[in-house]
């Protein structure tokens, strides 16, 4: 039986890495990937490892949390790296070592394996992790959609009707040259309402379509995806209309609790726009309190945005400047 090995930080995991793994899968019976912890990217090791597991379920992924940081071609570094790799493999025999780096020579010899150097000149896949980290959006053609979506900061704006969500979301998207997700529930309601109401069954169809559109936009986004509401808002409207939401909407609202990196609540301190499709300022104030209570019950942290559009944009940008997708939110709110 033949067994291939490749290793690296995969920071992020890109088409060049995929070429290594796919070549190994085509040439050997089993494939092992050793993935290292690193500080060159904020994405945690287990997230990067799961990219590989999801894209290549047959591959064995070994997480190297305590791997050596050294990189180079000195005798000391070679010895340290070889000893660590052999330790992590714990006696697992490797017949082929796949890489596109200089270390393919000494690591393959230490393993007693065939040195399979793949696209060392980066002609087939002309990209590197360093290039990608400088601008994920510019290099997204070299990233699986599964990987790219985990690099986008997913921002949701909540609030009662006429709290400025749409204007703010659109303005931020234009400023950051990225995509924004309109409130699909509002679009659906305008098309399907009868006497200003839709059925509970119709509510069940809104969140799945909203999520489908949102995921499509996330694959096109540049650093941020700004979302005008999410399934939690649809859940709140269904509860307001019918007393209770349906099971699909309830589940998707629950999932939405963890699907966003940042939540902002637009305050009611701006003038109420009394259009035919709304139910008055008193209803706005009441619905806002219900949203706040629901967020508290769900234990979702959020930032309240107040003032005019310019003030709110600056409040959001002040948070975004300090925010790290895989960091601790409390660090920027302290």
What role is predicted for each listed range?
Residues 165:
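Conserved lysine of the Walker
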Residues 160:
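P-loop (Walker A) phosphate-binding loop of NTP-binding proteins
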Residues 173-215, 316:
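Conserved substrate/cofactor phosphate-moiety recognition/catalytic segment
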Residues 168, 172:
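Hydrophobic positions on the alpha1 helix immediately C-terminal to the Walker A/P-loop
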Residues 157:
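Hydrophobic anchor at the beta1->P-loop junction of P-loop NTPases
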Residues 1-153:
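Nucleotidyltransferase catalytic core that binds NTPs
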Residues 196-245:
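Conserved nucleotide-sensing/catalytic segment adjacent to the nucleotide-binding pocket
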Residues 132, 242-308, 324, 331-333:
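A glycine- and Lys/Arg-enriched "phosphate-lid" helix/loop adjacent to the NTP-binding pocket
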């Amino acid at each position: 039986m033949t067994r291939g090995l490749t290793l690296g930080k995969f920071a992020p995991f890109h088409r060049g890495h995929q070429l290594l793994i796919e070549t190994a899968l085509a040439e050997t019976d089993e494939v092992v990937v050793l993935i290292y912890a690193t500080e060159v990217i904020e994405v945690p090791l287990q997230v990067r490892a799961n990219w590989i597991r999801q894209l290549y379920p047959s591959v064995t992924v070994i997480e190297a949390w305590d791997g050596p940081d050294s990189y180079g071609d000195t005798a000391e570094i070679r010895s340290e790296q070889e000893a660590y790799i052999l330790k992590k493999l714990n006696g697992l025999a490797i017949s082929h070592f796949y890489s596109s780096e200089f270390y393919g020579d000494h690591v393959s010899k230490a393993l007693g394996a065939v040195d399979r150097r793949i696209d060392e000149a980066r002609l087939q896949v002309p990209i590197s992790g360093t290039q990608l980290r400088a601008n994920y959006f510019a290099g997204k053609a070299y990233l699986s959609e599964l990987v790219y979506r985990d690099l986008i900061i997913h921002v949701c704006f909540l609030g009662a009707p006429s709290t400025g969500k749409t204007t703010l979301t659109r303005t931020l998207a234009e400023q950051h040259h990225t995509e924004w997700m309109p409130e699909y529930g509002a679009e659906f309601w305008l098309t399907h309402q009868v006497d200003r109401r839709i059925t509970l069954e119709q509510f069940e169809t809104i969140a799945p379509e909203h999520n489908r559109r949102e995921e499509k936009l996330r694959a096109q986004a540049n650093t941020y995806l700004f979302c005008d509401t999410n399934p939690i808002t649809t859940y709140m409207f269904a509860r307001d209309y019918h007393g209770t939401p349906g099971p699909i909407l309830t589940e998707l609202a629950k999932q939405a609790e963890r699907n966003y990196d940042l939540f902002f609540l637009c305050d009611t301190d701006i003038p109420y726009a009394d259009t035919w499709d709304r139910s008055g300022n008193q209803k706005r104030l009441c619905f806002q309190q219900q949203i706040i209570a629901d967020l508290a019950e769900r234990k979702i942290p959020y930032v309240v945005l107040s003032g005019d559009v310019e003030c709110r944009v600056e409040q959001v940008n002040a948070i975004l400047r300090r925010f790290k997708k895989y960091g601790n939110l409390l660090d920027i709110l302290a």
